[in-house]
Amino acid sequence: MDQKLYLSVDCGFDKFKCCIGDYLLAFSSKMIDVTNSINALSVADGDNTYIEYKGSVYMFGDSIDQIISMKSNLKMYAEELDSNRNKQRFKDRTFHISLLAAIGYSIVAYDTVYNPEKDVDKHLFRNLSNLQYFIGIGLPYGSMNEWPQIKEFLKQRHNFKIRRGSKSCTFDFDLDLSNANFLCNAQVITAFLFQGASSDGNLTIDKKALPCIMMDAGYKTVGLFELAKNLSINPETAFSDTDHAMYNIDKYVEEKVKDAGREDFSYLQVQYHARGEGNPAVRKNTTVINVKDIYEKVLAEEAIKLCSLLEGKYSLDDVENMFITGCTGIAYYPHIKKYMAEHHGLTKVVLTNRADDGSEISPMYAIVIGLHKQLKNRYK
């Protein structure tokens, strides 16, 4: 009998968060076409990751942030990367290929990092044709109507290569998903399932925690909905806010850094300097501009604006909890918690960072874990 493989992908604008079996991994969802670039021909690319698909070569993953920290590279790839972060991305062929890269890379990482079986013949990669696939996809609430086209692309046989570093570390995929079972749900809904469902996908939330507001704050959208005591969702309370996401913060930071003298600075570089591994400052002649300090100030200001939006949309004194998840949610959490304590003191603000066993887990995985619970419950 074929082995069952459950694999879920949270398609964030900033990162793919994946769950394969019980293994969690996250990496940048940025992708650039390097078919005609020397990067695609390099013998020693370090940690760079690539997908070769139908004659084209694309780089994806975290190393892209380092590449675009250089002005020359940023100019070359700015338009392409900008489209990665547009809501129209889910219609785009490049996104479809990046999703295929996420699925393939998850399988490679499971075999080589999470479960490095000495007998390579037991690796998932070596048994692709013997696997029964169950695949979950998490999309923004406002992009759920793109799922039929995404599913149509995925539900076929795919031949591609995943390469890590040098060409000697290449995985040649013949991945037939034509008979795979798929499930797609809105990210903000599956974020709630992380908090309110057991590991087998059954709802277990204490009614005393309701009514509640669920906030999934990501790079391009802040997904919100209100859950009543009877576990119903009023559609009027569910929406995707596109004015207070991390993208908006990065754009404001870009403006301020430019005003300080670095007119060539791009919002695409904020991740690297303010939240990543890069130098927190940039220079203009003898002037040092601290990008991280600017980012922290803008973040605090936008958190207050978001709280004002919530006050206009919901009756914050009448809900028991506000559950916050997502990478941007992590950044917003201390500011929102402080504001709520001062203005709506009896409403608890909870960061979704506890797994079923009580252990601490990064809130950025809440969506994909909730999705994975639902996937396994749907296809037992």
Would you name each region that the model predicts?
Residues 1-212, 232-233, 242, 291-295, ...:
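Nucleotide/phosphate-binding catalytic cleft detector across ATP-hydrolyzing
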Residues 16-20, 222-227:
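Short beta-strand scaffold segments in enzyme catalytic cores
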Residues 36-39, 188-192, 219, 225-269, ...:
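Glycine-rich phosphate-binding loop plus the immediately following alpha-helix
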